Structures are given as structure tokens and as C-alpha cells.
């Protein structure tokens, strides 16, 4: 019996098989979509997944303006930020944010589902969200993935 075959293989930056993936946001619900994109960024669908390493894929999201928000979330969901000055709390509804910058709506949802540490910041840099179906990463020959096929 070969005992070397029972070693646990841990991925590192050099051995991570990172690919470029295009995902279409049209017709998807925001939270469910963001959850699957976060799993792709994290690399959890790969057999070589290692929790402390950036072994996920680079994800390009297209048609960010066509994402769905269910129920009354478009009018009632608020995004709160603070300027840093006293009394500087500002808020936007999802409807206003979708009109101003629909890509930011998807980015905030995905970022909230990534780890809140250095690794999460590094993983978030692998996300590219685009309004419309055009993107500037054609040179990387990204592979189109249907999120309905993923669990």
C-alpha cells in the first residue's frame, strides 16, 4: 500500500487553476445570484478548494442592470453609508442605486458574501461587473457559465 497517495493536497498561489468566467445576470434574483458568484470567486466548486488561498476564478458579470429584486425591496431596501462627519449618515434606496449605478448593486451584494479579511479583499478584486453585455476582457477568452447548472 502506497502511503504517499493518502496525502492531503493543499492548493497554493502557484498551483491554483484560475480561469475567466462570464456570467449573465439577466433574470436572476440578486441574493441568489450573488451567492453563486461568491462561491465561484472563492473556488468552492473546485476539488482543489483550500480555505485560506485565492483558488477561485475571475468572474465577469454582464447585464447587471437586468437583475431582479423580489417583493418591495426595490423601494424599501436602503443602503446606508457615513461620510465621517457628525450627522453625515446618508442613505439610498435600491431603486435610486439601480438608476445611478446598477453595477454597484451587484458588487455590494457579492462583497457582503465574501470573507471580511485580506483574502476577501483579494477575492473581490477578481470580480468585474459590467452594465450591458459588453466587457473588456475578451483577450482572456472567458468561458460562459450558466448559474442554473450550479448548486
Model-predicted regions and their roles:
Residues 133:
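Flexible, active-site-proximal loop/turn residues at the rims of small-molecule/cofactor binding pockets
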Residues 120-130:
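C-terminal structural segments of small proteins and small subunits
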Residues 1-107, 118, 136-151:
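Ribosome large-subunit tunnel/peptidyl-transferase-proximal elements
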Amino acid at each position: 500500500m502506497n502511503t504517499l497517495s493518502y496525502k492531503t493536497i493543499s492548493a497554493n498561489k502557484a498551483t491554483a487553476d484560475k480561469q475567466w468566467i462570464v456570467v449573465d445576470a439577466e433574470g436572476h434574483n440578486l441574493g441568489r445570484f450573488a451567492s453563486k458568484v461568491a462561491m465561484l470567486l472563492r473556488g468552492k466548486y473546485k476539488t482543489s478548494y483550500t480555505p485560506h488561498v485565492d483558488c477561485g476564478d475571475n468572474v465577469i458579470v454582464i447585464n447587471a442592470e437586468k437583475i431582479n429584486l423580489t417583493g418591495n425591496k426595490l423601494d424599501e431596501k436602503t443602503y446606508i453609508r457615513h461620510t465621517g462627519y457628525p450627522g453625515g449618515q446618508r442613505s439610498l434606496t435600491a431603486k435610486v442605486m439601480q438608476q445611478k449605478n446598477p453595477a454597484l448593486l451587484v458588487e455590494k451584494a457579492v462583497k457582503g458574501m465574501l470573507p471580511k479579511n485580506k483574502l476577501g479583499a483579494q477575492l473581490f478584486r477578481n470580480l468585474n461587473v459590467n452594465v450591458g453585455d459588453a466587457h473588456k476582457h475578451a483577450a482572456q477568452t472567458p468561458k460562459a457559465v450558466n448559474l442554473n447548472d450550479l448548486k
